[in-house]
């Protein structure tokens, strides 16, 4: 009888310690923030996804919750996804322009790779994006009417403010202490490139990006929050991203290539729409972008997921 009691006690102790070990490893939901313009929105053609892609997405959906708010010009109602990681049913003009029915952004294959590497973890992705928007104007954390007017964005939403409100509203659904913010992905820069509206958007890009990063970190009380930038836009804008990544800790610039021989090759659509190149990253390009985000996060910041 004493042996039986001892055996039961030992089993209970082992079970409890084993359960606590699992809880300590998986108890907190890991939150990623995503923001930017149309290439963060994503135009990757979901119909090109392979059977293996779909299988891996289905597995990732067990681990990754996903909230997405996307807006666009002249359409009042946003696209909202509030569920698990998935592809997007976009606006009709996007379907026509890119000859697609459904699409995806960097989050999809970033999430697929993340779930494969961390099958025991739970994640929440919160994404806020709007195409054709600048950091100088709509995304500026130090928004002014004058800056917005310079970029013809005075009638657009104050996107930094809206981004914070969107993230806050989703975090309020979680219990205090049940989550930790472990990274932010930023895909934006095209609208600050060129000289159509003068040199200021490009010249002040590093200053505005630094302000955005610092304000996000302060607001969410994560002073060393990993911040990953995709190098998009003009060479001058990308050089400003590089400058920011050198001057701030835990900021990584992800370089992509249009050379098909490079490992970081990110091809774009090659057809025209209304007499202009459609541009934007296609299935292969957007898939690679998601994978590049994961590779860089895992290389530099894997210690944030424990």
For each feature predicted by the language model, list its residue ranges.
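Bacterial Sec-dependent N-terminal signal peptides
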Residues: 1-21
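Cell-envelope and extracellular/periplasmic
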Residues: 21-306
């Amino acid at each position: 009888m004493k042996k039986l009691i001892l055996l039961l006690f030992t089993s209970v102790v082992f079970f409890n310690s084993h359960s606590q070990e699992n809880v300590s490893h998986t108890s907190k939901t890991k939150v990623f923030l995503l923001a930017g313009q149309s290439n963060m929105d994503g135009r990757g053609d979901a119909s090109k996804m392979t059977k293996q892609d779909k299988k891996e997405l289905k597995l990732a959906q067990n681990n990754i919750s996903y909230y997405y708010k996307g807006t666009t010009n002249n359409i009042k109602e946003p696209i909202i996804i509030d569920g698990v990681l998935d592809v997007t049913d976009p606006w009709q003009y996007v379907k026509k322009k890119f000859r697609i029915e459904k699409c995806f952004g960097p989050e999809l294959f970033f999430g697929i790779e993340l779930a494969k590497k961390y099958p025991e973890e739970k994640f929440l992705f919160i994404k806020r994006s709007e195409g054709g928007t600048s950091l100088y104007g709509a995304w500026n954390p130090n928004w002014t009417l004058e800056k917005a007017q310079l970029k013809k964005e005075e009638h657009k939403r104050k996107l930094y403010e809206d981004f914070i409100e969107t993230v806050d509203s989703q975090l309020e659904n979680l219990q205090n202490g049940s989550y930790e913010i472990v990274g932010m992905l930023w895909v934006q820069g095209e609208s600050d490139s060129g000289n159509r509206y003068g040199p200021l958007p490009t010249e002040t890009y590093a200053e505005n990006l630094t302000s955005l990063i610092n304000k996000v970190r302060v607001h969410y009380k994560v002073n060393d929050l990993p911040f990953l930038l995709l190098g998009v836009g003009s060479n001058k804008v990308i050089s400003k991203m590089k400058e920011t990544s050198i001057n701030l800790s835990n900021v990584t610039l992800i370089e992509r290539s249009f050379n098909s021989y490079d490992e970081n090759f990110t091809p774009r659509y090659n057809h025209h729409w209304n007499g202009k190149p459609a541009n934007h990253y296609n299935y292969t390009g957007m898939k690679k972008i998601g994978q590049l985000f994961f590779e860089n996060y895992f290389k530099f910041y894997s210690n944030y997921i424990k």
